[in-house]
C-alpha cells in the first residue's frame, strides 16, 4: 500500500492545518541564545514555507480562528479595561495614543512614499508593533464589506500583502523593541534600577519577590516566662507579633479552654498558642521571642489552611491601598497580586483595581470572610460557561454587523471590533459577578492560542506563494520601514512620557511595552531595572492598547479606501 502524503495534504485542509501547526509549534520552541522564536513566528514562517511549496488552504477555518482569538483578547482585557481610568490612567491612555498615532502616521507616510499599497502598509504596522489584533482588524475591515473598494481592486491580493508585510516585519518588531528598551536607558544616561527604587520609595512600595512557598504552616508553642515578661500585659495588637515575625496567633489554649483571639487578647505565661506563618517565619520565631517548648496538641493544631485566589470587586475596596485591608489582623497572608495576567511587585501598598486577583493563604474561614469583604473567591472549576461564551460571541457578531449611514458615508465596526467589545463586556461582568461567564484560565489560553495559530496558518499559506517575489521586489524597503515603525514611535513615546507626562523612566518603559502588548520586552525592562516595578506600567497600558491596536488596523485601511 502506497500513501502519497503530499497528495493527502493537497486534498485535506484539516490534515494540512494540523501538520503546519505541529511543525510551526516545534519551530517556536527553538531558542537562539536567550531568545525563543515563539509560537506566532514559528507557525507563520512554517505556513509561509508550505505556501511557497504550493499548498493552499481553502477552508473558512481562518475566520473562526481570528474570531476566537480577538474575542479571547477582549475577555482578558475586560476586568481591567475600565480601571485604567483610575490613578495615572489618563497618562497611560495618552501615552498609548501617542505611540499608536505616531506608528500609524509613519506607516502611512512610508507606504505612500515607497508606493507599497494598503495591504503591505497594514502588514508593516501590525508586524512592526508585533500586534496580531491590528492585523485582524485590518483584514476584517476588508472582509466585512464596511469599506467600498475601488474598481478592479483585488481583495485577496491586498489580504495576501498584509500577511507578507506582517511576516517580514514581525521579527524586526519583536527584536527591535527588546533592543530599544534594553539600551535606551544607557543612551539617556539613566540607571533604571535606581529609577525603580525611586518610584518604589515615592509610592511606599517595596520590590520583594514572591515567596517560594505559598502555603503557611501551623506550629504550637507553650509561652515561657521570658516571652510573657516581654509581652508585659500588652494586647496582640500592641505587641505586633506579626510585623516582627510574620506569624499570626490563630488559637490560644488557656486552662484547657480553646479560643480564637482577636487583636485585644493578651497572652499569658503557660498559654499554649497556635501560630500560623511561613516556614522561614517559624524558623526565626524562637530567636526573636524566646518561646518555651513547642507542643503537639491535635485540637490546637486542627486548622484548615487554604490558599485561594480572590477577585477584587467591591467598590469600597477599589482604589484603596492593599495595606488598608489589614490582612494581618484578619489572619491572612498575601502571596501575590496579579493584574492583566501580569504579576505585580510583591507589596501591600499597591492600589487595588477591580478585577485584580489576590492570592491569599490562611485559615479557611478567615480567608472566606476576607473574600466576602473585597470580592469573591475565584471558581475552582474546569467547566467553561459555554452559554455565556456563545451568547456574548453572538452579541459581538451582531455589534460588528451594524452599520450607520451618514449621507454617502457608511460606518460600521466590523466583526473584529464587535467581538473585542463583547469580550471586554464579558470579562468585565465576570470580574463583578462570579457566576457569570466563567472560563478557566487554561481553557481561555487554549482558545486564544489555537485561534491565533489557525489564523496564522491560513494567513501564511495564502501569502506564501508570493513571498519570494515580494522579497526580491520590496523586501529591503519593507524591512527598512519596519525598523522605523518599530523604533521611532517608541522614542517619541519615551520623550513624550519624560517631558510632558513627567513619568518615572522605569514605569514609562514598562508602559511603552504594554502599549505594544509585548510581554518579552517587558521582561527585558524588568531585568534591566532589576525589579518588577515596570510591570505596573505594563498593566496600565496593556488593556486599552489591545482595543486601540485593533482599531488602528481598521483605520490604516481606511486611509486608502
Swiss-Prot record:
One GO cellular component, as annotated:
plasma membrane
The organism that produces this protein has a lineage beginning with: Bacteria, Pseudomonadati, Pseudomonadota, Gammaproteobacteria, Aeromonadales
The record's Gene Ontology biological-process terms are:
potassium ion transport
Give the protein family.
Belongs to the AAE transporter (TC 2.A.81) family. YbjL subfamily.
Cleavable signal peptide = none
Localization per Swiss-Prot or TrEMBL: Cell membrane
RCK C-terminal domain segment(s): 206-291, 293-376
Q: Which Gene3D superfamilies match?
A: Regulator of K+ conductance, C-terminal domain
Q: What is this protein called?
A: Putative transport protein ASA_2308
Query: What PROSITE patterns does the database record attribute to this sequence?
Result: RCK_C
Q: Major place of localization? A: membrane
The UniProt transmembrane annotation reads 8-28, 37-57, 66-86, 90-110, 161-181, 386-406, 409-429, 450-470, 476-496, 541-561
Amino acid at each position: 500500500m502506497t500513501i502519497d502524503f503530499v497528495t493527502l495534504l493537497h486534498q485535506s485542509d484539516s490534515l494540512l492545518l494540523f501538520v503546519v501547526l505541529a511543525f510551526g509549534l516545534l519551530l517556536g520552541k527553538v531558542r537562539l541564545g536567550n531568545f525563543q522564536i515563539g509560537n506566532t513566528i514559528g507557525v507563520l514562517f512554517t505556513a509561509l514555507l508550505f505556501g511557497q511549496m504550493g499548498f493552499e488552504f481553502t477552508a473558512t477555518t481562518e475566520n473562526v480562528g481570528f474570531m476566537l482569538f480577538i474575542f479571547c483578547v477582549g475577555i482578558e482585557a475586560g476586568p481591567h479595561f475600565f480601571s485604567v481610568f483610575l490613578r495615572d490612567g489618563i497618562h497611560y491612555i495618552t501615552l498609548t495614543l501617542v505611540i499608536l498615532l505616531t506608528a500609524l502616521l509613519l506607516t502611512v507616510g512610508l507606504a505612500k512614499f515607497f508606493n507599497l499599497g494598503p495591504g503591505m502598509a497594514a502588514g508593516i504596522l501590525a508586524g512592526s508593533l508585533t500586534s496580531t489584533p491590528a492585523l485582524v482588524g485590518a483584514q476584517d475591515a476588508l472582509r466585512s464589506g464596511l469599506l467600498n473598494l475601488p474598481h478592479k481592486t483585488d481583495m485577496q491580493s491586498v489580504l495576501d500583502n498584509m500577511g507578507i508585510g506582517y511576516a517580514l516585519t514581525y521579527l524586526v518588531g519583536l527584536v527591535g523593541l527588546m533592543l530599544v528598551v534594553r539600551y535606551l536607558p544607557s543612551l539617556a544616561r539613566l540607571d533604571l534600577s535606581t529609577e525603580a527604587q525611586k518610584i518604589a520609595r515615592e509610592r511606599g512600595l517595596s520590590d520583594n519577590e514572591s515567596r517560594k512557598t505559598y502555603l503557611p504552616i501551623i506550629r504550637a508553642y507553650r509561652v515561657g516566662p521570658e516571652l510573657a515578661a516581654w509581652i508585659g500585659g500588652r494586647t496582640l495588637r500592641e505587641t505586633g507579633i506579626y510585623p516582627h515575625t510574620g506569624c499570626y496567633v490563630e488559637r490560644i489554649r488557656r486552662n484547657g479552654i480553646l479560643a480564637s483571639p482577636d487583636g485585644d487578647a493578651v497572652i499569658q505565661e503557660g498559654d499554649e498558642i497556635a501560630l500560623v506563618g511561613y516556614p522561614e517565619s517559624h524558623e526565626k520565631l524562637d530567636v526573636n521571642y524566646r518561646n518555651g517548648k513547642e507542643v503537639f496538641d491535635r485540637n490546637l493544631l486542627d486548622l484548615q489552611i487554604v490558599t485561594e485566589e480572590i477577585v477584587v470587586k467591591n467598590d469600597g475596596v477599589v482604589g484603596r491601598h492593599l495595606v488598608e485591608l489589614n490582612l494581618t489582623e484578619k489572619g491572612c497572608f498575601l502571596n501575590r497580586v496579579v493584574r492583566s495576567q501580569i504579576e505585580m511587585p510583591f507589596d501591600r501598598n499597591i492600589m487595588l483595581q477591580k478585577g485584580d486577583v489576590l492570592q491569599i493563604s490562611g485559615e479557611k474561614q478567615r480567608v472566606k470572610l476576607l473574600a466576602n469583604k473585597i470580592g469573591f473567591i475565584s471558581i475552582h472549576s474546569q467547566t467553561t460557561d459555554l452559554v455565556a461564551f456563545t451568547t456574548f460571541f453572538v452579541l459581538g457578531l451582531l455589534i460588528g454587523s451594524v452599520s450607520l449611514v451618514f449621507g454617502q458615508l457608511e460606518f460600521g465596526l466590523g466583526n473584529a471590533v464587535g467581538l473585542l467589545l463583547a469580550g471586554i463586556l464579558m470579562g468585565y461582568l465576570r470580574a463583578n459577578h462570579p457566576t457569570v461567564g466563567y472560563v478557566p484560565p487554561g481553557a481561555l489560553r487554549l482558545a486564544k492560542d489555537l485561534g491565533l495559530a489557525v489564523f496564522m496558518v491560513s494567513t501564511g499559506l495564502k501569502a506564501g506563494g508570493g513571498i519570494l517575489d515580494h522579497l526580491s521586489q520590496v523586501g529591503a524597503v519593507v524591512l527598512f520601514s519596519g525598523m522605523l515603525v518599530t523604533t521611532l514611535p517608541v522614542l517619541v513615546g519615551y520623550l513624550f512620557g519624560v517631558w510632558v507626562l513627567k513619568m518615572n523612566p522605569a514605569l514609562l518603559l514598562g508602559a511603552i511595552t504594554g502599549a505594544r502588548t509585548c510581554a518579552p520586552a517587558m521582561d527585558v525592562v524588568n531585568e534591566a531595572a532589576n525589579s518588577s516595578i515596570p510591570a505596573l506600567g505594563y498593566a496600565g497600558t496593556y488593556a486599552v492598547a489591545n482595543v486601540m491596536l485593533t482599531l488602528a488596523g481598521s483605520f490604516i485601511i481606511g486611509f486608502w479606501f
